[in-house]
Curated annotation (Swiss-Prot):
Keywords assigned: ATP-binding, Coiled coil, DNA recombination, DNA replication, Endonuclease, Exonuclease, Hydrolase, Nuclease, Nucleotide-binding
Keyword 4Fe-4S: no
UniProt name for this protein: Nuclease SbcCD subunit C
Organism per entry: Deinococcus radiodurans (strain ATCC 13939 / DSM 20539 / JCM 16871 / CCUG 27074 / LMG 4051 / NBRC 15346 / NCIMB 9279 / VKM B-1422 / R1)
Binding site for ATP: 32-39
Listed InterPro entries: P-loop_NTPase (IPR027417), Rad50/SbcC_AAA (IPR038729)
Pfam families listed in its UniProt record: AAA_23, SbcC_Walker_B
Region forming the signal peptide: none
Amino acid sequence: MKPLHLTLRGFTAFRQTTDLDFADLELFALVGPTGSGKSSLLDAMTFALYGETARLGATGLDALISQGERTLSVALTFEAGGQTYRVTRTRGRKQADNEVRLDRLDPDGEWTGLSSGSQKDIAQRIEDVVGLDFDTFTRCVMLPQGQFAALLHGKPRQRQELLGELTGMGRVQQMQTFAADQVKDFKHQSQSLSSVLASEYAGVSEEAAAAVRAQREQTDADAERLLQQREELRTQLQRCANXXSLSSREDTARRLTVQESRXEGVRQGAERARRARQVAGVLPLLDAAERARIAYDRQTRELAGAESALQSAQAQAARADAALTQAQAQEPRIPELEEQANALREAEADAARLKRAGGSVQATHANPLPWDEDAFETAREAAQKLEKLRVERSILESEKAALKAALERYAQEERQQQEETAQLERVKADGLKAKEQLQVAQQREEEARMEAGLASYRSHLHEGEPCPLCLQTVHEVPEGESVDLDELRGQVNLLQKLVQERREHFTDLRGQLKTRQLWLDEKKSEYHDWNERNKQRELDARELERHISGNPQDDLQRLLASLAGRVRQAGANPAQARRDRLAEIQSIRSRIQEAQAALSRAQGDLAAAQATAQPRSMGGEREADHLAAADALTKALASLNLTAEAARTAGLPENEIAALEEGARKHEAEVAQLRAALADLDRQLGLEAFDPAHLAQVSRDLTASDAALSTAREQAGRLAEQERQLRDKLTRKADIETQAAEAGRQLDTWQTLNNALKVNEFQQFMLAEVEAQLLTRAGLLLFDISDGRYRLSLDKGEYVVQDLWNAGEVRAVKTLSGGETFLASLSLAIALSDYLAGNKVLGALFLDEGFGTLDPQALEAVATALENLRTQGRMVGIVTHVESLSERLPSRLLVSKSMAGSNVIRVDG
């Protein structure tokens, strides 16, 4: 790929349309100050081809649009694969403004569009035409020369890291990362499946399913047996039910026995009810005496507590009053502290002013000026104007240099115009002369042709005979001269060719003169306006300089020194000191407020304690009530000959007493009734035998049989469901085992690939292979561009150079001079470019310099090497700041920046 023509507009610093013709450039320098737009020209090429740049990538491309412009456009004409293409890319601040076109130049001179499909399709088509993707293109065509110098002098590990970065070996790391992620995923999948098999399907097997089936069949057999047993028990129960009437006597006898066994308990209950009736009148006296005692004890405790609380409240009030007096003693200090805080506020403001002004507390000056805000702003504005003036003068000098170069080229073109005008006159005169010679030769040829035609009839003339043409008698046969028509015809052809060459030369010269004259006329006006603008800018700069008096920067330092002195007088940290004063004021006021609040609380507690304390006479009333209740209780207990505890134990509620008495009466009546009924049944049944125990046993057996049958049927259903679930789990288990086996195979595959792609194995092997190929290519290239003096090789892990002009001496690259280092790094750069390009032929290289100022000998070596590169058919562009190097190159592209935007001027020679 070789660039032929670049047109850009609205692209970063290039606001206006800029045309750059690379067609006849072989070796050139791209020169300009920092920020002028040199890199933007390279970015424009990558943007045109790929829609992205090395600095921005594929995002944030609106930053490429010149400020104030709505769109940018870049058109790059280039040659690839023996054909000429043109890619045009437009980008706007709106999505609708974005467009890309690809055209191919046909042999008939017409452009054929190749822009069908989406923008993605067009981008892929462009990449196919160029033969390189974006990353490879930037590494192959735009070589970072400085990194190759670091590659030469780096340690082996550093060289491999840098080489991996230059060759894009990071993709191997991405592959390894992807493989590691796959290992992690398949390992997790395999472990999860194995865990499921071990936990949820541990007991799932064909044997377990067969065992459940056998258990279900046995349970079905048991259920059938229990069904037969239940029918037999039902028959027995029916026979026993026929004699159910005989059980009435046994039931009556049983009930009588139960009632007789309860007789002692009923008697004791009746006795307890009788005692409770005796003590019923004493129980209220017991309760009254207890309540009087409790009230007397509580009154005694409350009086003691109130007295203690009153003493405590009095002591607390005294302490609170003393604390308030102590806090109020600090209150007179507040005005003094507030005055100090106000003074520190002004010092804090001075510190803030000093910080905003860009000064420091340590600033000093031998002759400080008293601080004045207006004077400082005036001095700062003057200093800014002075800095702006310095920048403007620097830009103006650059503009003058660019104009000078442009005028030199203009003068050269003007001289060329004069020389070619004179040449045109000479070509015209030569053409007219050749035309006259052609006319003479053509006339001679015509005459010779006529002569030859007549001579062809001479053989038919005989003396005394009539002429075959005029029929007159021939008296004498004339003699004819032999003429070589072929020679004359050859002379005419040569003269015709000469006239045609003169005519074509004349037409070409006249077209060139016309085109150059148009350019001269246009540039004459343009350079005149340029010169006038420079003069006006010079006048403006002088006018601005005239209004700036003294030394504004020194005035700024003097004012800041005065302000810094004021800040230092206030202490190292006036803001902290002021905060300390304010905090102390707040602390004094807070202590006073807290003491007042504490005194108020203590006085409230004292008033409450005084109100709580009751007269001691109330304690005497409670004591009299207690003694009276105790005397009444003693008399009542003495009449019953009981103690208070015995009376309380014998006491029952009225409802319980009534219940016990009623229970005794009912028991006596029921026993009498049962005895009469039993005697009557004995008379009715006589001696007939009846066994109720057998009937109960049959009934129990039948109930148990029903329960067992139901349980057996439920168990059979559960076993059938369990068998079905086991069969389903067996199917799922087989599927999971298949998945686990597949996950294991995938894990083994990705684990092997991951181990192979690790940095310490595969990538180092790849880098070693790349390094070996690079050194081979770079060594051959270094041999060519150094006129057969140097070769580059690897010795014990270090780069060395073999000096063939010095008996093959081997030297470490660290001992090379600046020029020699440049040759070696240049060889590495171009070797890497060829390696990355593969089988794609690169017709252009752009190198950044990667070196500083060169001595004359090194400069000569570099210039010779670059000249050798040009002879290899490459277009080589050097992005450099070294003026001495750029002047040695055949052509220079001078990039300059002005208010109207950047522009490029080509200087040849």
